[in-house]
Amino acid sequence: MERIVITGALGQIGTELVLKCREIYGNDNVLATDIREPEEDSPVNNGPFEVLDVTNREAMMAIVENFKADTLMHMAALLSATAEKNPLLAWDLNMGGLMNALETARTYELHFFTPSSIGAFGDSTPKKDTPQNTIQQPTTMYGVNKVAGELLCQYYFTKFGVDTRSVRFPGLISHVKEPGGGTTDYAVEIYFEAVRKGRYTSYIAKDTYMDMMYMDDAIDAIIKLMEADSDKLVTRNGYNLSAMSFEPEQIKAEIQKHYPGFALDYEVDPVRQAIADSWPDNIDTSYSRKEWGFNPKYDLAGMTELMLKAIEEKEQNK
């Protein structure tokens, strides 16, 4: 990878992916794009930026051609809870954008990455140690998009030889950008509210286990997969990824080691709870570890300490 275009660069993953790629490959070699201009204080302002609507294929191709890109990381998407509220928009953006990105990758012979998700699984999937290859019958529009996306990426690799690669992300936890529209977002919000208010009301019920990962591990995984030898990638599209699995009470216990008075109560959102209930409790990541060396660094305790310290600094500097 030498010249990288990233769509959805102002999103939760995109923002940090842009920064890490610029750190490794150089600021001027990573072009950030999104549907809107960044705020003045956005961290992505440290390098080139273009406004891009991913549903406009001609505009996407023009940006890739003008930048002389060799890699396209397609991160633009409507997330799970938001997609469920507006399924037609989700299909148009998530699938239309992906098709345009894949066609762009085919036309310009690009290395290609796009994220899938644990949302690609459903009620009929084994919930414990969910295998890499298993039943995928999601009950949400977001999940349907992700399953279709995995199949499309594999199709473009098999049919056209496009170097497609993707991972099934769990919930991703970060202090850099506050989340929006995801089912696992409670696991980010809880840290911000612990620092700001000393309490949190969870929309996800007690004893609801979901796979999670600290954002630094997620970004490192993308780059490690993209730098891996293509010949060693057997699975290629939709690698299971996770660093930990927990439920709300376990985060509370870790936060209370730093904030003993922290209080947690519940006001369950039936839409997001139903989505969470359809997902695995924990997934098998052995294929990712074996084929390209996935090895996350952070567990719940380490992540909690980092999150609280970082948010405390943010709040003090406001």
UniProtKB/Swiss-Prot annotation:
CDD domains referenced in this protein's UniProt entry, alphabetically: TDH_SDR_e
Pfam families noted in UniProt: Epimerase
Swiss-Prot/TrEMBL GO biological process terms: threonine catabolic process
A GO molecular function held by the record: L-threonine 3-dehydrogenase activity
PANTHER family according to UniProt: L-THREONINE 3-DEHYDROGENASE (PTHR42687), L-THREONINE 3-DEHYDROGENASE, MITOCHONDRIAL (PTHR42687:SF1)
Family in the record: Belongs to the NAD(P)-dependent epimerase/dehydratase family.
Record's protein name: Uncharacterized epimerase/dehydratase SH2450
